[in-house]
C-alpha cells in the first residue's frame, strides 16, 4: 500500500493533489450536467448534438498543437496553470449564470465548449508535465498514476452528486459549483515551495519546435505503436458521454439520477485501473495490448446487456481497462522521453488522446441516432480490438513475441528492448 501512494510523501505533490481532486470533482460535475442539458433540455435526445459539443471541446487540442507543447516546454508551467485554471473557472461561472437565469441556448453551450477547448489545449500538456516538476524521475510513473486515480475518483463522486443536484436545483447550479471548485487548485499553485520543484532544461536548452517532437516520435517504433493504439481507442472508444447518456435514455429510459449512478459506476472501475497502474514501477507495452483487448470485450458485452444493472457491471470492466490503458500509455511515454522533449511529446499524446475525439464523436453519435446506442458501443469494441492488433504487430515485428505452453498454460516471451535516442529508456 505504501508503494501505491509513495508520491504523497512529497509536500508539493501532496498540496497539488489535494487541490486538484476538488477541481476534478467540479469538472466531472460540469461534464455530466452539460451532456444532460444538451440531451434533455436543449434538444430532443440528440446524440449528434452531444457529439458536436465534444468535438468543439476537444478539437482545439489538434488545431493548437504547434503552440501548446511549445508553451509547456518553454514557459513556467506553474504560471501557465494559474492562468488556464482561472480561465476555466470563469467560463464555468458564465455558463452557470446563463443557465440559472434561463437564457442558455444550444449555441451558447457550443461556444463555451469551444472556448473551454482552447483553454484546455494549453492547460492539459502543462498540467501533465507539471507532475515531473513536482516529483523526481523515480516517482514519476507513480505520480502520473495517482493523478489519474484522483481524476477518476472525482468521476465516481462528481456524476453521482450531479444527478441529485440536477433533480433538486437544476443544471445551472452545477456549473456555478464547478466555478468555485477551481479556488483550491489555484490556492495550491500559489502555496507550492518553488525551491523544491525539480527543474527541467530551460527554453534555451530545449531543442527545436514541434516538428522535432514529431521527428523524435517517428524514430521510435515503440512510441509510434503506443500512440497509434491511443488514436484508435481515443477517437472511437472513449466517447463515454455519448455511450452512457444514450444508453441511459434510449435503451433503459432512465432519469437524471440513474444516469449519474451509471457514470459513477464506470468510475469505480476507472479508479481500480489507475490504482493497479500506480503499483507498477514501470508499465510495459504488453499491458497496453491486454487492456485494449479487455476494453473491446467489455464494450461488446455492454452493448448486449438487457438492463441498466447489468450494463453498470460491464461499465466497471470498461472503466478499469480504459484507465489501465490510458494511464499506462501516459506513464510509458513520459518516462521514456527525454526531459527536454517531454512537453512536445506529451502535447502530441494529448492531442491524440483528446483531439481525436472530434473525429470519432460525431460518427459515434450518428451511429447511436441512426441505428441505436448499442451499435455505438459496438464501434467502441471495434476500436479496442484494432488497438490490440497494433500492439500485437509491434511486439511480433520489433520484439520477437513468442507464445508457448508452460505447465499446460500459455505464456509469452519477448526480446529485451534495444537502446534508443540519447540513452532514453524505450518502452518495455
Can you name each region flagged by the protein language model?
Residues 1-427:
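Alpha-helical transmembrane-bundle signature of multi-pass membrane transport and export proteins
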Amino acid at each position: 500500500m505504501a508503494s501505491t501512494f509513495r508520491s504523497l510523501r512529497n509536500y508539493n505533490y501532496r498540496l497539488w493533489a489535494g487541490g486538484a481532486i476538488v477541481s476534478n470533482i467540479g469538472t466531472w460535475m460540469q461534464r455530466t450536467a452539460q451532456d444532460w442539458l444538451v440531451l434533455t433540455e436543449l434538444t430532443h435526445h440528440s446524440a449528434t448534438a452531444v457529439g458536436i459539443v465534444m468535438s468543439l471541446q476537444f478539437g482545439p487540442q489538434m488545431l493548437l498543437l504547434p503552440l501548446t507543447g511549445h508553451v509547456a516546454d518553454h514557459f513556467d508551467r506553474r504560471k501557465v496553470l494559474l492562468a488556464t485554471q482561472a480561465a476555466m473557472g470563469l467560463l464555468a461561472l458564465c455558463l452557470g449564470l446563463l443557465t440559472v437565469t434561463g437564457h442558455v441556448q444550444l449555441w451558447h453551450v457550443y461556444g463555451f465548449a469551444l472556448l473551454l477547448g482552447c483553454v484546455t489545449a494549453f492547460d492539459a500538456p502543462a498540467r501533465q508535465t507539471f507532475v515531473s516538476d513536482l516529483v523526481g524521475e523515480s516517482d514519476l510513473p507513480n505520480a502520473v498514476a495517482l493523478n489519474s486515480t484522483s481524476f477518476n475518483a472525482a468521476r465516481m463522486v462528481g456524476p453521482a452528486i450531479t444527478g441529485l443536484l440536477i433533480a433538486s436545483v437544476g443544471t445551472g447550479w452545477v456549473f456555478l459549483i464547478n466555478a468555485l471548485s477551481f479556488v483550491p487548485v489555484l490556492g495550491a499553485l500559489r502555496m507550492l515551495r518553488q525551491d523544491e520543484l525539480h527543474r527541467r532544461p530551460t527554453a534555451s536548452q530545449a531543442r527545436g519546435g514541434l516538428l522535432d517532437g514529431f521527428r523524435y516520435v517517428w524514430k521510435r517504433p515503440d512510441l509510434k505503436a503506443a500512440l497509434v493504439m491511443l488514436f484508435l481507442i481515443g477517437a472511437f472508444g472513449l466517447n463515454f458521454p455519448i455511450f452512457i447518456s444514450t444508453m441511459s435514455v434510449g435503451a433503459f429510459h432512465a432519469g437524471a439520477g440513474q444516469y449519474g449512478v451509471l457514470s459513477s459506476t464506470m468510475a469505480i472501475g476507472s479508479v481500480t485501473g489507475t490504482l493497479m497502474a500506480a503499483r507498477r514501477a514501470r508499465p510495459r507495452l504488453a499491458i497496453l495490448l491486454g487492456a485494449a483487448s479487455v476494453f473491446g470485450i467489455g464494450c461488446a458485452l455492454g452493448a448486449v446487456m438487457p438492463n441498466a444493472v447489468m450494463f453498470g457491471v460491464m461499465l466497471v470492466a470498461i472503466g478499469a481497462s480504459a484507465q489501465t490503458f490510458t494511464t499506462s500509455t501516459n506513464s510509458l511515454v513520459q518516462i521514456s522521453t527525454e526531459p527536454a522533449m517531454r512537453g512536445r511529446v506529451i502535447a502530441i499524446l494529448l492531442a491524440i488522446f483528446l483531439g481525436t475525439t472530434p473525429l470519432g464523436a460525431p460518427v459515434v453519435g450518428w451511429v447511436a441516432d441512426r441505428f441505436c446506442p448499442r451499435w455505438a458501443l459496438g464501434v467502441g469494441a471495434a476500436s479496442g480490438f484494432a488497438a490490440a492488433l497494433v500492439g500485437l504487430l509491434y511486439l511480433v515485428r520489433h520484439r520477437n513475441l513468442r507464445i508457448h505452453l508452460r505447465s499446460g498454460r500459455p505464456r509469452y516471451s519477448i526480446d529485451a528492448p534495444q537502446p534508443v535516442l540519447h540513452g532514453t529508456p524505450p518502452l518495455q
